[in-house]
Design a protein with these regions (language model features):
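Juxtamembrane interface elements at the cytosolic ends of transmembrane helices
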Residues: 2-8, 130-158, 189-197, 215, ...
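N-terminal alpha-helical transmembrane segments of multi-pass membrane transport
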Residues: 2-112, 132, 136, 140-207, ...
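Inter-helical loop and helix-membrane interface segments of multi-pass membrane transporters/permeases
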Residues: 8, 100-116, 144, 153, ...
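Hydrophobic core segments of alpha-helical transmembrane domains in multi-pass membrane transport
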Residues: 28-39, 57-64, 95-98, 121-133, ...
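Membrane-interface helix-loop-helix modules in multi-pass membrane proteins
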Residues: 68-144, 219-254, 272-291, 412-415, ...
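Helix-loop-helix junctions within the multi-pass membrane cores of secondary transporters/permeases
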Residues: 88-89, 140, 147-180, 319-323, ...
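Membrane-embedded translocation segments of transport machinery
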Residues: 343-434, 441, 470, 481
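Conserved small/polar residues in nucleotide/adenosyl-binding loops
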Residues: 576-578
Length: 578
């Protein structure tokens, strides 16, 4: 397609303006670390992450335009490019890496070292950028008219609107201030309780909520529809399944509970939360796995056509013009970088991956980077089935590793390491595509943005290990505070293939529940995540969704935009307490 040849970006190719400056790099690195930490906590707690591009863009505009009195839209764009890389890297890392901490808690292995986490994050992030760069001309330029890249286009619109003034940043900073005050009142002064609950003793059920602005922000962002499906999943778990378990089997015990620990004893000692953590989580994990597989199956025609079309588009090669807006990283740099990352993955002892695993990473990594880069252009990053890609990778790689003779905990750690790298590759490739679309619309230099992506990956990659260790030290993974739903699911998949020692009855209950939801045309993943997570989290998310519904009914479009910005600020600062 050649419609793009007539496209004129906001900043013409012949005009040179500030992009990569000390200010943009420092601000971008700070935001990459902050948003990466915030999204890591958010994803581990409620099983979903939010885009950082727009809040990063608004904050950068506020600082650069209002405080520093500079007028440089491309400088602000580079800030959001670097900053959003941290959010995407965290989203990929938290889906898999906490499984290693869960095994350490069970005494199967030592906790992963900071070096291991950092190298996996860096290698996955850098490969995600490098795999995507050769696709830019095919996807962003040649198919400009057909691949819309919703988040990338929206971010460009926000930056263009900011050219009229930087006042919008005040809403983000006011949201941050409100969140900081609230956290101080709840956790510092303890004037307001952090959670409230009500137990129905005769029914053996329980309902409650946690009083945190971050959860309200999530509910507001996802909206009432998704929030309600999550809440219904929790209601089914806590008001139907838990009471049924207590009613029909009080004097029995089921795996994985310790032999002799009856259901009645579990409930007497720990209440409904003990039944949830021992049994319902496995049902939820089965539902999440099924939801991911269903999502992947439904996306297969699109995935196949996406990969085929991307390969066809690349046959013509990259644009070799000298125009500033046509400049990419040189192919020899890309190839050397890919080879270097693969050698590090294979050769460094801290990463538990052998040459076969490194080969799997190259094959699956490039495939899913291509798929992710194109799919986010068609359906947006929010609908990109990264977890489904991770499940498919783990299923195949675990079977290959087991077939090669590497079994036990060593084989399981290798499978998780491979899955972690692939998950990060897919997430970063999708983010890079969105950012390059923003730059294409604004007239940014692609090469500069690609370097910015690498800077963001390195900054957040160096920080993510510390974030995971802090969360583990504060609460530990797998409990009510930090359930880590996707990581628990990946752990379950690997264990099931390697050892076959899972409570399959509970898992298949979740499978059939998910299939039932699909038959009823109810979105499976929100319901499954709600079933897996504690009801305390989803009740607060539901309230946020209701607030969004009420606000949407009363406010016009401009005010909705302002409300979204307040929510973003509230969400991100409320998570900084980690």
């Amino acid at each position: 397609m050649n419609e793009n040849k007539e496209f004129k970006p906001y900043i013409p190719a012949e005009k040179v303006t500030a992009e990569m400056t000390v200010t943009s790099v420092i601000m971008g690195v700070i935001l990459a670390i902050v948003f990466g930490a915030a999204n890591a906590y958010l994803g581990l707690r409620v099983g979903m992450t939010v885009s950082a591009s727009i809040p990063a863009a608004v904050i950068s505009m506020g600082v650069i335009r209002v405080i520093m009195k500079k007028n440089s839209i491309l400088e602000s764009n580079l800030v959001q490019t670097i900053g959003s890389a941290g959010e995407s890297l965290a989203a990929g890392a938290i889906f898999t890496m906490p499984a290693l901490f869960l095994w350490a808690e069970e005494g199967l292995c030592d906790k992963p070292s900071l070096v291991e986490i950092t190298l996996i994050a860096l290698c996955g992030g850098i490969l995600g950028v490098l795999f995507m760069v050769p696709l830019r001309n095919a996807l962003i330029v040649k198919e400009h008219a057909t691949l819309l890249y919703p988040e990338g286009t929206a971010c460009a619109d926000v930056l263009l609107a900011g050219e009229e003034g930087g006042a919008n940043a005040s809403t983000v900073f006011s949201g941050m201030g409100l969140a900081a005050v609230f956290k101080f009142v709840v956790d510092g002064l303890k004037v307001i309780p952090a959670d409230v609950s009500a137990a129905f003793t005769s029914l053996k059920g329980e309902i409650g909520m946690e009083v945190y602005p971050a959860l309200l922000g999530v509910g507001y962002i996802v909206g009432p529809r998704i929030a309600s499906f999550m809440f219904v999943g929790s209601l089914v778990g806590w008001m139907v399944i838990i009471p049924m378990i207590c009613l029909f089997g009080p004097d029995t015990w089921l795996y994985p509970a310790a032999q002799g620990t009856t259901i009645a004893d579990l409930y007497a000692n720990g209440g409904a939360a003990a039944i949830w953590s021992t049994y319902v989580k496995y049902i939820g994990a089965g539902a999440i796995a099924t939801g991911g597989i269903i999502s992947l199956i439904k996306s297969l025609p699109l995935i196949i056509s996406t990969f085929r079309d991307s390969m066809k588009s690349m046959k013509g090669g990259s644009v070799k013009g000298t125009a500033r807006t046509d400049q990419d990283l040189q192919m020899n740099f890309i190839l050397i970088g890919i080879i270097a990352m693969v050698v590090i993955i294979w050769a460094v002892p801290a990463i538990p991956v052998n040459p076969l695993g490194a080969l799997l990473i190259v094959i699956f990594g490039f495939f899913f980077a291509t798929v992710s880069s194109r799919m986010v252009g068609m359906i947006g990053s929010s609908n990109n089935p990264v977890s489904g890609m991770a499940i498919a990778t783990l299923l195949i790689s675990t079977m290959v590793i087991k077939g090669s003779g590497q079994t036990g905990i060593d084989g399981m750690k290798a499978a998780i390491a491979i899955g972690s790298v692939i998950c990060i590759i897919a997430a970063i490739a999708g983010d890079t595509s969105q950012d390059l679309k923003t730059g294409f619309l604004l007239g940014a230099t692609p090469k500069t943005q690609q370097i910015g992506e690498l800077i963001g990956v390195v900054a957040s990659g160096l920080a993510i290990g510390g974030v995971l260790y802090l969360l583990d030290a504060a609460w530990g993974y797998g409990g009510a505070e930090v359930p880590a739903p996707q990581a628990g699911l990946m752990k379950m998949i690997v264990e099931g293939i390697m050892g076959g020692n899972l409570p399959w009855t509970l898992v298949f209950i979740g499978v059939f529940l998910a299939i039932g939801m699909e038959i009823l045309r109810i979105p499976v993943m929100p319901f499954a995540i709600g079933l897996y997570l504690p009801i305390y989290l989803n009740a607060t998310i539901m309230i946020g969704g209701v607030v969004r519904m009420l606000m949407d009914g009363r406010k016009n479009v401009d005010e909705n935009t302002k409300n979204d910005q307040v929510t973003d600020g509230t969400l991100y600062l409320s998570l900084i307490h980690i």
